[in-house]
Amino acid sequence: MGQSKSKEEKGISGTSRAEILPDTTYLGPLNCKSCWQKFDSFSKCHDHYLCRHCLNLLLTSSDRCPLCKYPL
């Protein structure tokens, strides 16, 4: 007991591990920026997308988008 040799550590040399990134494919143009639901019909506002339902709601209140302040 106590006379066993410890195992040699095998170092990983020269290989880098893959960086783990969260799955963000559900963000971006696939979702409405106002309600964040996935829909089929989108309208492009200045730098984001709005679904048809949110676009109609926003147009009843103002000519400008409350998210980016550009004209709808």
Curated annotation (Swiss-Prot):
InterPro entries: Z_RING-type_Znf_sf, Z_RING_Znf
A GO molecular-function descriptor: zinc ion binding
Main location: virion
Signal peptide as annotated in the record: none
PTM remark: Myristoylation is required for the role of RING finger protein Z in assembly and budding.
Superkingdom assignment: Viruses
A Pfam match: zf-P11
Lipidation (N-myristoyl glycine): 2
UniProt cross-references to SUPFAM superfamilies, sorted A to Z: RING/U-box
Compartments in which it is found: Virion; Host cytoplasm, Host perinuclear region; Host cell membrane
One Gene Ontology term, aspect cellular component: host cell perinuclear region of cytoplasm
ZnF (RING-type) residues: 32-68
Domains (record comment): The RING finger domain is essential for the inhibitory activity of protein Z in transcription and RNA replication.
Functional description taken from the UniProt entry: Plays a crucial role in virion assembly and budding. Expressed late in the virus life cycle, it acts as an inhibitor of viral transcription and RNA synthesis by interacting with the viral polymerase L. Presumably recruits the NP encapsidated genome to cellular membranes at budding sites via direct interaction with NP. Plays critical roles in the final steps of viral release by interacting with host TSG101, a member of the vacuolar protein-sorting pathway and using other cellular host proteins involved in vesicle formation pathway.
Subunit-level organization: Interacts with protein NP; this interaction probably directs the encapsidated genome to budding sites. Interacts (via RING-type zinc finger) with polymerase L; this interaction inhibits viral transcription and replication, Z partially blocks the product exit tunnel for the releasing nascent RNA product. Interacts with the glycoprotein complex; this interaction plays a role in virion budding.
Record-stated family: Belongs to the arenaviridae Z protein family.
Name by which UniProt lists this protein: RING finger protein Z
Protein source organism: Lymphocytic choriomeningitis virus (strain Traub) (LCMV)
